[in-house]
């Protein structure tokens, strides 16, 4: 299955919420009606969505937020289910601990897609070593740094400036002047932003 490359706003409108697929310079809600489905006048349906439909829709939404394809998402769920604790919370913590997501949370990329590109292009160091695997799991205490040659990229400076204005998550510590951040800890469920109902995903895979 190929990664979606079409209009990002269409995906957010389909889910009825901002998936944060575009730069945060301007709220997506200011650009388009998120409560209107894609299409010339917004698609409508008289039928009520089934429980299965709601569960499937929630899974698709989370996959799109984190830029994960189906096979990989299933692996994340299997690992989350294997671990002790709440499966849904475990799933979100695994997704939040991905290298590309951590780079995004630290403000080095304005979107997860941009952060993923920085990782793939070897612009990111983890504990002083180049790591170009977006799905790599980051652990507490790991230090993320922008490669020296990449610090001159305007897009990184702009993304960092925006992140400083909006504030960083509590589970990362960022030194913008050094282009460096520390992954302090895996976030608790209450610390993970986003309109996500992970219990629907657990119900879907438990069918």
Curated annotation (Swiss-Prot):
Residues 42-53 have a biased composition (Polar residues). The keyword Cell membrane does not apply. Residues 97-160 form the S4 RNA-binding domain. GO terms for molecular function: rRNA binding; structural constituent of ribosome. GO terms for biological process: ribosomal small subunit biogenesis; translation. Keywords: Ribonucleoprotein, Ribosomal protein, RNA-binding, rRNA-binding. Residues 30-54 are annotated as: Disordered. InterPro entries: Ribosomal_uS4, Ribosomal_uS4_bac-type, Ribosomal_uS4_CS, Ribosomal_uS4_N, S4_RNA-bd, S4_RNA-bd_sf. GO terms for cellular component: small ribosomal subunit. Pfam families: Ribosomal_S4, S4. It comes from the Bacteria. Belongs to the universal ribosomal protein uS4 family. Part of the 30S ribosomal subunit. Contacts protein S5. The interaction surface between S4 and S5 is involved in control of translational fidelity. One of the primary rRNA binding proteins, it binds directly to 16S rRNA where it nucleates assembly of the body of the 30S subunit. This is Small ribosomal subunit protein uS4. The gene is rpsD.
């Amino acid at each position: 299955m190929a990664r979606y490359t079409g209009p990002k706003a269409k995906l957010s409108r389909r889910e009825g919420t901002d998936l944060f697929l575009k730069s945060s310079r301007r709220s997506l809600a200011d650009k388009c009606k998120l409560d209107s489905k894609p299409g010339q006048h917004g698609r409508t349906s008289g039928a009520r969505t089934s429980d299965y439909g709601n569960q499937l829709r929630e899974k698709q939404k989370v996959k799109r937020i984190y830029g994960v394809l189906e096979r990989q998402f299933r692996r994340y769920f299997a690992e989350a289910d294997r671990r002790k604790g709440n499966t849904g919370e475990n799933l979100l913590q695994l997704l939040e601990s991905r290298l590309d997501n951590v780079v995004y949370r630290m403000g080095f990329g304005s979107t997860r897609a941009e952060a993923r590109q920085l990782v793939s292009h070897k612009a990111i160091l983890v504990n002083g070593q180049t790591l170009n695997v977006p799905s790599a799991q980051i652990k507490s205490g790991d230090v993320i740094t922008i490669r020296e040659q990449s610090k001159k990229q305007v897009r990184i400076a702009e993304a960092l400036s925006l992140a400083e204005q909006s504030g960083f998550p509590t589970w990362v510590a960022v030194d913008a002047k050094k282009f460096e951040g520390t992954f302090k800890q895996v976030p608790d469920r209450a610390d993970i932003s986003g309109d996500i109902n992970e219990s629907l995903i657990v119900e879907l895979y438990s069918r």
